[in-house]
């Protein structure tokens, strides 16, 4: 693997998927100088379209891949990018504590919410499906977590909040 100069600034990319997390540190020329991986537990799947993960498992995986990077490399990180599975959503409080499980991209239980959306959304709107982020949000807000949550966040947004201490900014 090519190496960067020990004084080069590094940029860290964190990729969260459904089965694992990967971190790559690269220099400003795009040379990858370090890579780490961690596994995630499988999503909980149940009847009725349920597909959930616990956000705490995401955080443990992200923390693990960052911790595995050499300390000298971590000190040189100047910017960070996080991506995650699209349409994976959770509710949390102002401090980022999850108030709900994370409904994963393939969770399609929000049929009542998607029926509500279908009454007002254009026929070709992606918000109309039971797996849409809007349908998931309405479903969660109508449950117990909706009474205590202050933020609805996608996977990458929650991880960004955990890393920065700022939630609800994206």
Task: Provide a role label for each language-model segment.
Residues 1-100, 148-150:
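N-terminal glycine/serine-rich phosphate-binding loop of ATP-dependent small-molecule kinases
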Residues 67-170:
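Glycine-rich phosphate-binding/catalytic subdomain of phosphoryl-transfer
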